[in-house]
UniProtKB/Swiss-Prot annotation:
Recorded superkingdom: Bacteria
Reactions listed under catalytic activity: holo-[ACP] + H2O = apo-[ACP] + (R)-4'-phosphopantetheine + H(+)
Protein name: Acyl carrier protein phosphodiesterase
Pfam families: ACP_PD
Enzyme class of the recorded protein, top EC level: hydrolase
Family stated for the protein in its record: Belongs to the AcpH family.
EC code(s) of this entry: 3.1.4.14
Species assigned in the record: Escherichia coli O45:K1 (strain S88 / ExPEC)
MF annotations from Gene Ontology: [acyl-carrier-protein] phosphodiesterase activity
Keywords assigned: Fatty acid biosynthesis, Fatty acid metabolism, Hydrolase, Lipid biosynthesis, Lipid metabolism
Length: 193
């Protein structure tokens, strides 16, 4: 899962959106650095990552990547799940339009920015002003996201080519998304994530 899915599931679980978004920028034990609600959100994010990576649908989807891109398949798929969530948001969350949700999420996250790591602050400078969560529905933007990640981290250069795997398996990936994401929404609503 990437930014949008983590925020969405956190909202459904009544967990800290801030903690769920911040988690990838925090190493080790967060208890000494953040308030309890943010810590709980960080832990929820980590549980979701482990759960998602081990779902049969996600394991199967990783196998569709070519040898030269399979190493980055988990990252690429995380971004792709956000694409499908953004694209189908009105079906999955009909009572909370994506643009409104984005504003709500931004307000929640802004409360912790002063005490956040610089890389997280930098992400937030772009995430909200450039409307990433809404733009995830556009596959050209997904390609741009993957290229940007590859540019910032040369060891992830294969992300550039992983775009072709997404394109080749788009329909099958969308089917897998519909198989697992509604289940995760239900688990989040029951606070079982």
């Amino acid at each position: 899962m990437n930014f949008l899915a983590h925020l969405h599931l956190a909202h459904l679980a009544e967990s800290s959106l801030s903690g769920n978004l911040l988690a990838d920028f925090v190493r080790g034990n967060p208890e000494e650095s953040f308030p309890p609600d943010v810590v709980a959100g960080i832990h929820m994010h980590r549980r979701i990552d482990v759960l998602t990576d081990n779902l049969p649908e996600v394991r199967e989807a990783r196998e569709w990547f070519r040898n030269e891109t399979r190493r980055v398949a988990p990252i690429t798929l995380d971004v792709m799940w956000d694409h499908f969530l953004s694209r189908h948001w009105s079906q999955l969350s009909p009572d909370f339009p994506l643009q409104e949700f984005t504003c709500y999420a931004r307000e929640q996250v802004m409360t912790i920015l002063p005490d956040s790591p610089p890389r997280f602050i930098n992400l937030n400078n772009y995430l909200w002003s450039e409307q990433w969560l809404v733009r995830y529905r556009d596959m050209d933007f997904i390609q741009s996201v993957l290229n940007g990640m590859a540019s910032r981290r040369p060891r992830l250069d294969a992300l550039r080519d992983s775009w072709y795997d997404l394109d080749a398996h788009y329909d099958a990936l969308e089917t897998r998304f519909w198989q697992f994401y509604p289940r995760m929404m239900e688990q989040a609503s029951r606070k079982a994530l």
